[in-house]
Amino acid sequence: MEFRVIIPARFDSTRLPGKALVDIAGKPMIQHVYESAIKSGAEEVVIATDDKRIRQVAEDFGAVVCMTSSDHQSGTERIAEAAVALGFEDDEIIVCLQGDEPLIPPDAIRKLAEDLDEHDNVKVASLCTPITEVDELFNPHSTKVVLNRRNYALYFSHAPIPWGRDTFSDKENLQLNGSHYRHVGIYAYRVGFLEEYLSWDACPAEKMEALEQLRILWHGGRIHMVVAKSKCPPGVDTEEDIERVRAYF
């Protein structure tokens, strides 16, 4: 099975401008993401950006770069433009790996592509990992996902879902029981789906939560979630996250 990885990267991040180029262990963060994608065994890895600074840095460490519009509201929109520009076929599998996920395991990238290949009835495959810390559950920067019994996504939110009506009032003594999952910012989809996604209007929930994947659920699409077997540390959204990732390396 062949798949390609596109890494959407922008400089003007709302919460942490310039984070794609922040130094982590002697390399820009985007390079760590790129190297994980290369190790996954992808047929091709491309960085899609609208910023000349990111392009220059990426080309300096040997990456293929596709320049895109600065008008995109999400990584999926940026990837859709890049896939067309690169001439990818509708049935090809693309993994969208966010540029702020420097600790993503390469095997998780491949597993996601394989999962989509095995499920013809879904629009998208994505990744989640069990939440084991109470602070992470209540962290608004952490996106949570609720699954059904077959691991299809029911809803995504920055809020701590599902809400424990009888237990969440006592956070200090809260014991998590394995029913909460953090969404990891990586998706697999076929190129042909991207055109369909762009034809859909953004839904109210997507606008409220600022989560692009809610558009898929709103319009009746199915997202199959792979529960990661190896640890997937959170991505980078804050200065504290940068220090955490630096300590990891």
UniProtKB/Swiss-Prot annotation:
It holds the Pfam family CTP_transf_3. InterPro entries: Cytidylyl_trans, KdsB, Nucleotide-diphossugar_trans. Its EC number is 2.7.7.38. It is an enzyme of class 2 (transferase). Pathway: Nucleotide-sugar biosynthesis; CMP-3-deoxy-D-manno-octulosonate biosynthesis; CMP-3-deoxy-D-manno-octulosonate from 3-deoxy-D-manno-octulosonate and CTP: step 1/1; Bacterial outer membrane biogenesis; lipopolysaccharide biosynthesis. GO terms for molecular function: 3-deoxy-manno-octulosonate cytidylyltransferase activity. GO terms for biological process: CMP-keto-3-deoxy-D-manno-octulosonic acid biosynthetic process; lipopolysaccharide biosynthetic process. It comes from the Bacteria. Keywords: Cytoplasm, Lipopolysaccharide biosynthesis, Nucleotidyltransferase, Transferase. It catalyses: 3-deoxy-alpha-D-manno-oct-2-ulosonate + CTP = CMP-3-deoxy-beta-D-manno-octulosonate + diphosphate. The keyword Nucleotide-binding does not apply. It is found in: Cytoplasm. The keyword Cytoplasm applies. GO terms for cellular component: cytosol. Activates KDO (a required 8-carbon sugar) for incorporation into bacterial lipopolysaccharide in Gram-negative bacteria. Belongs to the KdsB family. This is 3-deoxy-manno-octulosonate cytidylyltransferase. The lineage of its organism: Bacteria, Pseudomonadati, Pseudomonadota, Gammaproteobacteria, Legionellales. The gene is kdsB.
